[in-house]
């Protein structure tokens, strides 16, 4: 009895959630901290969701419980909701998550624009090069040149790589124009291909009043997609990151490496101990869905040095007092006693977890004489673009590390297992209007305009008269598991040229690829790539890109002898990949 009283006094709200006493919880929440953690690292909302107590979860969400917070194991509330298998729970949590994210986006834009206002005016180009050592992927990796103008509280960002859709890269000419003040902002998305402009004007207080929970109702197919797909959480682990100067020269004569990047001398650093950790949960899937997921696993992952650990469901510890969301019949006294060892027992549906870890090396080119400030001028813009772009979001996570001195004029970071992004800054203050050359080649340091004297022509921020304006269009883009969507798209790109039949099964929450054996896949891929060159078809859906045009022209001119030589080279690449596979298995 004393133990029960102790639990009630130390964790009164958690105990109400445990018992699903949602009516009393409603009364007690008015003066209590809804984000307090229990001894197992769960907030009230996490506890309610893990136990499947929908009524308590709704009460907590009405009281503004943080729906984005992670528990002690690094899972979000939405992850745990999907794990319950309850469509109502997923619907409720997803609706509040989207409402929260939209609110945060609206609140954050004016603050970022204020930071931009305080920074000196400038123009810069960011060249994005997506690269891969896997031949099938490297052929379809796109490039993009991002042009940025900043003048006062005005900002314009031009891009051509829009993202992923239907397993292909989407291209187009887009400009994002931001204008703002202390309490207002104007956002414009300019579609130069269709000559259409979507504008959104908002006063922060009025916009927040218009935003309602009813506007964020998820579609039923989105709930179904999550419940029939693995829960996948991909993160970049940089807690043990280390920066080391790259060496050049022969053994005994090695020196610190330096390179000239767009006219600026830069020191080259290797960034070590960067890991991509992918965690996959499948306990909410049916046996048929689990079987299909295992069969559809991408066999190319074995080539990538991925270390995988699988953790099955909890053992046969269930008792007659167990429930679906408390299968090992943990008592409140056991759960809330921080000194009590639960061993492998836990609340919630028994986890079926796979963890994949892959270490990467990133590379930095740091210049101490670069005319831009990373913190004052560049990071606020990356923060702003990260709200609508997955690769900008990954760059933001990386660029906020404690870098060596200087400006990162060139960065190479992993985006996904087989895909790297190389970002190069150049042509600083080399373009004051939108009509000038879009070349990415940087100008020498001595030719760059002084930052204090550089002025951007204000026509850059104006809309051409021939464009159609859709005023007050709602165009808030939510990043819905963007890294997982990117992961899925890249894996599908790997297999795009090797498919001989339609895909089957539902779309996944993340990186589920549809394939069979590695040998059969790679053989089909080689055959398809040869047909691609002969027939002028694009394997990765990049018919819009200039690279495809040049490759197509080259393919049309190839003779039969050159095609035979190409097939031989592909066979040699296959042998090299097989050798990498054997080495990776041996190292493990």
UniProtKB/Swiss-Prot annotation:
Biological process terms in GO annotation: negative regulation of protein localization to endosome; negative regulation of receptor internalization
Keyword Nucleotide-binding belongs to the record: no
Domain UIM, chain residue ranges per copy: 481-500, 517-536, 547-566, 572-588
Lineage top rank: taxon: Eukaryota
PTM (free text): Monoubiquitinated, inhibits interaction with ubiquitinated EGFR.
Any one cellular-component term (Gene Ontology): plasma membrane
Swiss-Prot/TrEMBL keywords: ANK repeat, Cell membrane, Endosome, Membrane, Phosphoprotein, Repeat, Ubl conjugation
Signal peptide: none
Molecular function terms, GO-annotated: ubiquitin-modified protein reader activity
Major subcellular site: membrane
Post-translational modification Phosphoserine, affected residues: 205, 584
Subcellular location: Cell membrane; Late endosome
ANK repeats: 40-69, 73-102
Ubl conjugation recorded as keyword: yes
Domain remarks in the Swiss-Prot or TrEMBL record: The UIM repeats 3 and 4 are required for binding to ubiquitinated EGFR and 'Lys-63'-linked ubiquitin.
Function field: Ubiquitin-binding protein that specifically recognizes and binds 'Lys-63'-linked ubiquitin. Does not bind 'Lys-48'-linked ubiquitin. Positively regulates the internalization of ligand-activated EGFR by binding to the Ub moiety of ubiquitinated EGFR at the cell membrane.
Assembly and interaction partners: Interacts (via the UIM 3 and 4 repeats) with EGFR (ubiquitinated); the interaction is direct, inhibited by ANKRD13A monoubiquitination and may regulate EGFR internalization.
UniProt protein name: Ankyrin repeat domain-containing protein 13A
Gene: Ankrd13a
């Amino acid at each position: 009895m004393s133990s029960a009283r102790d639990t009630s006094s130390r964790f009164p709200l958690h105990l109400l959630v445990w018992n699903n006493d949602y009516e009393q919880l409603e009364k007690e929440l008015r003066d209590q901290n809804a984000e307090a953690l229990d001894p197992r690292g769960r907030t009230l909302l996490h506890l309610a969701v893990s136990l499947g107590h929908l009524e308590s979860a709704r009460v907590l969400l009405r009281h503004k419980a943080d729906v984005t917070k992670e528990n002690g194991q690094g899972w979000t509330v939405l992850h745990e909701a999907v794990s319950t298998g309850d469509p109502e729970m997923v619907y409720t949590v997803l609706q509040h998550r989207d409402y929260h994210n939209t609110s945060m986006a609206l609140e954050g834009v004016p603050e970022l624009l204020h930071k931009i206002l305080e920074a000196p005016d400038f123009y810069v180009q960011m060249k994005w090069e997506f690269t891969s050592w896997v031949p099938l992927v490297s052929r379809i990796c796109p490039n993009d040149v991002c042009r940025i103008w900043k003048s006062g509280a005005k900002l314009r960002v031009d891009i051509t790589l829009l993202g992923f859709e239907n397993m292909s890269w989407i291209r187009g000419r887009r400009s994002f124009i931001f204008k703002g003040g202390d309490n207002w902002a104007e956002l414009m998305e300019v579609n130069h291909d269709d000559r259409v402009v979507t504008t959104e004007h908002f006063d922060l207080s009025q916009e927040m009043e218009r935003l309602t929970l009813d506007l964020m109702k998820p579609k039923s197919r989105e709930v179904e997609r999550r419940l029939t797909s693995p829960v996948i959480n991909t993160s970049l682990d940089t807690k043990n990151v280390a920066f080391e100067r790259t060496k050049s020269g022969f053994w005994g004569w090695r020196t610190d490496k330096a390179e000239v990047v767009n006219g600026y001398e830069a020191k080259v650093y290797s960034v070590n101990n960067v890991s991509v950790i992918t965690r996959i949960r499948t306990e909410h899937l049916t046996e048929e869905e689990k079987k299909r997921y295992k069969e559809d696993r991408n066999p190319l992952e074995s080539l990538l040095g991925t270390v995988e650990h699988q953790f099955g469901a909890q053992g046969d510890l269930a008792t007659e007092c167990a429930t679906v969301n408390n299968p090992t019949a943990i008592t409140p006294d056991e759960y809330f006693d921080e000194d009590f060892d639960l061993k492998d027992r836990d609340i919630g549906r028994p986890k079926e977890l796979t963890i994949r870890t892959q270490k990467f090396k990133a590379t930095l080119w740091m210049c101490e004489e670069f005319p831009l400030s990373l913190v004052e001028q560049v990071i606020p813009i990356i923060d702003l673009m990260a709200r609508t772009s997955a690769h900008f979001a990954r760059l933001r996570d990386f660029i906020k590390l404690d870098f060596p001195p200087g400006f990162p004029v060139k960065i190479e970071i992993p985006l996904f297992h087989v895909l790297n992004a190389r970002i190069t800054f150049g042509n600083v203050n080399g373009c004051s209007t939108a009509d000038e050359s879009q070349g990415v080649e940087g100008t020498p340091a001595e030719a760059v305009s002084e930052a204090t004297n550089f002025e951007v022509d204000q026509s850059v921020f104006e809309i051409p008269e021939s464009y159609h304006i859709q005023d007050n269009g709602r165009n808030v883009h939510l990043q819905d598991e963007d890294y997982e969507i990117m992961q899925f798209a890249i894996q599908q790109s790997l297999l795009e040229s090797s498919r001989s039949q339609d895909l089957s099964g539902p779309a996944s929450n993340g990186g589920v690829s549809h394939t069979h054996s590695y040998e059969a896949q790679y053989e089909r891929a080689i055959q398809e790539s040869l047909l691609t060159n002969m027939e002028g078809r694009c394997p990765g859906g990049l018919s819009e890109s200039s690279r495809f045009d040049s490759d197509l022209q080259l393919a049309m001119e190839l003779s039969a002898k050159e095609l035979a030589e190409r097939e031989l080279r592909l066979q040699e690449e296959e042998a090299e990949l097989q050798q990498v596979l054997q080495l990776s298995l041996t190292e493990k």
